[in-house]
Every structure is written in structure tokens, then in C-alpha cells.
């Protein structure tokens, strides 16, 4: 089935609630333990029929050639399904890149999901998962999950926790682009430490008073990132000073989020961050990626 009329889809971002780097494998990859939670910050992807795979983007700093994850995802499906037609993709880039929010991974997952249907390839969930992992460790989450999920392995071993975050989430981008490679090269190793079981702790995070558990959800990248980027550290300080129950770096940064019980406090700190010209988003309690 060709895409007869332009199709527009949101590709939501995520934050990490806790992120423990557990070991370095022989192949150079690091294993981790983390929780992924969706946030109401998204890119918009538009698809229309074309003779070849074409890509354009509203952000001129992002490549639109075969190094782009969206293009790679489209080519994987085209080759696997023996598809003759192409697709024109327009990426309205709203989620900051180099922020630890998984925007590029979410975009790639959206391409896999949309084109698998509209090219009538109808790959199984197992095959789609395999393609997702080949594109990036975060991609399977955006392809398969909707709410809070536990991730192990390199981030690709997922468990749906069938729950959502019960607080307002304010997510701030301090205008620093931090590469994942830099973060892994500078984080302070703590492999020998016994770490909390994030998967077991997650169900206890509810609106009925388990906020005392939140400090257990540390991010192993924080100390190295905060040492190098003082403005990123300051965002966490500001969020906590504004009444956040908890604040943390997301992924390898530079985005920082705060969890708030009340909407008014969340909106006040949003205004303060916007006054610094920092992009910011507000996610309501109970948010999921189901549209």
C-alpha cells in the first residue's frame, strides 16, 4: 500500500529514572539498569509518497543522508521487504539532540512502525525488534513500549511495568550537546557497588507517598557531566530549589528533569528556565505515548 496522502506522526522523547552502568562487555558496550519514562516532548514526522527515499529536516545541523537514523530505518525495511517505491520524510525537529532524551531513537522507531504498515511489509515484532536494536539501544523502547519500562542489557532488554509517572515532569535542555561517547569515556566507574533493584522499586513509586525512594534513582553519568558543565549542574540546583521532589540528569545529558507534585510550581520553574532561553517541556502525571 502506498502512502496516498501525507501522514503526520508524533515521536515522543523519554527520560531516564535512575541509570546504573553495571559493567563493560568484551565488545566495548556497557550494560546498564534503568527506567525509561515517556515525556510530552516530541518531534513530528511527515510521510508522503515518493519514488525514492528522501529526507528533509527543519534543523540544518542534522544530516539527512544515510547517516540519519530515519533514512537507515527506511532502507532496512525497503531492502527487507523488496519494496520498489520510496518515501519522502520531513522531520520537524523539536526534541534537542545530544540531550539524553532519545529523540533520534524515537524518530527511527516511528519510521519502522509507520513504513512496516504502509509499505505492507508486515514484519513480525521479532524482526522489527532486531532491526530496532541494530539502529540503537534505545530504539526498541520507543517501538514497543508506551509507559514506564525497565531496561537492562545495553538498554534493549525491556520489561513493561504497566505504570506511568504520577508527578508533573519538567524537562530542561541547558543548551549543551553532550555526546554519548564522551559521557561513557568520562563517567566514574562504580561496577563493584551493589545497586538498588530499579525494576523492583518502580511499582512503589505512586502518588500515595513513596517519594522517599526517589533519591535511590541515581544517574551514573551525573558526576562527570556536572564537573564539566556547570550550567547543567545549576539546572538541577534550580529545580530542587523550586520545590522538585527529585531532579536528575536524563541519560548522558545534558537535559535535566524535575518531578513536581503541583502544576503551579512546575509552571513557575518552567517560566524561570524559559527566561534563561532554555527549551523546556511539561509532562502531566500519567502520561503515556499512546495517542
Swiss-Prot record:
Protein family according to the UniProt entry: Belongs to the GHMP kinase family. IspE subfamily.
Cited function: Catalyzes the phosphorylation of the position 2 hydroxy group of 4-diphosphocytidyl-2C-methyl-D-erythritol.
Alphabetical list of HAMAP family matching this protein: IspE
Keywords assigned: ATP-binding, Isoprene biosynthesis, Kinase, Nucleotide-binding, Transferase
InterPro entries in alphabetical order: GHMP_kinase_C_dom, GHMP_kinase_C_sf, GHMP_kinase_N_dom, IspE, Ribosomal_Su5_D2-typ_SF, Ribsml_uS5_D2-typ_fold_subgr
Metabolic or biological pathway, per its Swiss-Prot or TrEMBL entry: Isoprenoid biosynthesis; isopentenyl diphosphate biosynthesis via DXP pathway; isopentenyl diphosphate from 1-deoxy-D-xylulose 5-phosphate: step 3/6
Protein name: 4-diphosphocytidyl-2-C-methyl-D-erythritol kinase
Amino acid at each position: 500500500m502506498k502512502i496516498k496522502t501525507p501522514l503526520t506522526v508524533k515521536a515522543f522523547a523519554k527520560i531516564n529514572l535512575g541509570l546504573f552502568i553495571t559493567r563493560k562487555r568484551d565488545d566495548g558496550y556497557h550494560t546498564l539498569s534503568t527506567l525509561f519514562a515517556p515525556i510530552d516532548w516530541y518531534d513530528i514526522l511527515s510521510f508522503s509518497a515518493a519514488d525514492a527515499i528522501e529526507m528533509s529536516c527543519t534543523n540544518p545541523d542534522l544530516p539527512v543522508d544515510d547517516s540519519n537514523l530515519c533514512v537507515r530505518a527506511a532502507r532496512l525495511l525497503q531492502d527487507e521487504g523488496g519494496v520498489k517505491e520510496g518515501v519522502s520524510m520531513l522531520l520537524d525537529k523539536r526534541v534537542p539532540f545530544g540531550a539524553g532524551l532519545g529523540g533520534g531513537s524515537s524518530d527511527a522507531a516511528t519510521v519502522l512502525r509507520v513504513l512496516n504498515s504502509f509499505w505492507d511489509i508486515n514484519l513480525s515484532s521479532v524482526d522489527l525488534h532486531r532491526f530496532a536494536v541494530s539502529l540503537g539501544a534505545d530504539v526498541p523502547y520507543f517501538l514497543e513500549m508506551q509507559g514506564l519500562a525497565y531496561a537492562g542489557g545495553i538498554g534493549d532488554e525491556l520489561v513493561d511495568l504497566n505504570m506511568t509517572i504520577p508527578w508533573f515532569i519538567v524537562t530542561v535542555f541547558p543548551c549543551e550537546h553532550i555526546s554519548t561517547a564522551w559521557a561513557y569515556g568520562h563517567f566514574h566507574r562504580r561496577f563493584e557497588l551493589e545497586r538498588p533493584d530499579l525494576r523492583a522499586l518502580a511499582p512503589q513509586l505512586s502518588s500515595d507517598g513513596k517519594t522517599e525512594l526517589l533519591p535511590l534513582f541515581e544517574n551514573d553519568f551525573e558526576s562527570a557531566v556536572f564537573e564539566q558543565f556547570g550550567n547543567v549542574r545549576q539546572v538541577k540546583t534550580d529545580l530542587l530549589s523550586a520545590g522538585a521532589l527529585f531532579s536528575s540528569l536524563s541519560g548522558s545529558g545534558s537535559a535535566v528533569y524535575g518531578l513536581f507534585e503541583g502544576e503551579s510550581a512546575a509552571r513557575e520553574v518552567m517560566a524561570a528556565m524559559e527566561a534563561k532561553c532554555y527549551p523546556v517541556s511539561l509532562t502531566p502525571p500519567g502520561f503515556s505515548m499512546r495517542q
